[in-house]
Amino acid sequence: MQAPALAPLLASLAAQGVHTAIETCGAAPAENFALVAPHTRLFLFDVKHAEEEKLRAVTGADIAEVGANLSFAAARTEVIARVPVIPGFNHTEAEMEGIFRFALSHGVRRVDLLPYHTLGRGKYAKLGREYALDAAMLTKEDLLPWKALGESLGLDAGIGG
């Protein structure tokens, strides 16, 4: 997030009545969120995992930093947690429940589940790179049990978004 450059732009847009939104994974210094939050009406916040080791191994992110930024954003404006559901990474009941509880503990009330897809496979081939995750694409129907789980915990859960 390029917060020092983005904050004045967001402020100008917000002053003109333009709806402002930021998509983030939350792996950024807290001061960045402090700069942009006053001018942001919606954060689309990627939450990939709730286990520190798994999150760090795959994304390099610090779960404490992500959680602190998620809490900060949720206390100030609307936040939708977006959970990419990825086979072999976060696709078990325990992992999904952990993600939902993590989101709830940081003030999030809305979660959108995003089914894993392989749309980037062709780009990797053109770059001569291996597509690391060779798993089948998930459908909306595959995510219905996770949607029901999220709702049972008190979340407004959706698929897609």
Regions found by a protein language model. Name each.
Residues M1-L114, L119, A125:
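Conserved AdoMet/S-adenosylmethionine-binding subsite of the radical SAM
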Residues A94, F100, L104-H106, L114, ...:
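C-terminal accessory regions of radical SAM enzymes
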Residues R101, A125-L149:
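A structural motif corresponding to the C-terminal lobe/cap of the Radical SAM core domain
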